[in-house]
């Protein structure tokens, strides 16, 4: 599961989101969602606080595109890679600026890379 938490939102929910992802996924990839005005690393610290470091596999990658590609490249036949949080959004908000970004486009490109070796 690729998961993050939005910036300038309820910090108390972030560890809960990390814990929920870990309970329901074999591998958790923590990444940026829409950090808005917050430091993306601080947001990931908050989400990671909900993880049990002894349980399961997880990694941390601030760059959402890199995180999505890594999750897809690590997937094996029969795996389901869930890319959570942003859904249909076509932007990522960083430092108050909405930059073009699409989970769907990144995932399609990563799947094409895997398919063509």
Model-derived features with residue positions:
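ATP-dependent carboxylate-amine ligase
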Residues: 1-117
């Amino acid at each position: 599961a690729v998961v993050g938490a939005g910036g300038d939102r309820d910090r108390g929910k972030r560890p809960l989101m990390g814990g929920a992802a870990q309970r329901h996924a074999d591998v958790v990839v923590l990444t940026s969602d829409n950090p808005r005005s917050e430091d993306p690393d601080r947001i990931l610290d908050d989400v990671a606080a909900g993880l049990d470091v002894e349980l399961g596999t997880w990694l941390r990658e601030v760059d959402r595109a890199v995180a999505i590609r890594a999750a897809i490249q690590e997937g094996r036949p029969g795996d389901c890679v869930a890319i959570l949080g942003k859904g249909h959004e076509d932007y990522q908000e960083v430092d108050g600026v909405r930059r073009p970004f699409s989970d769907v486009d990144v995932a399609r490109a990563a799947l094409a890379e895997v398919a063509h070796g």
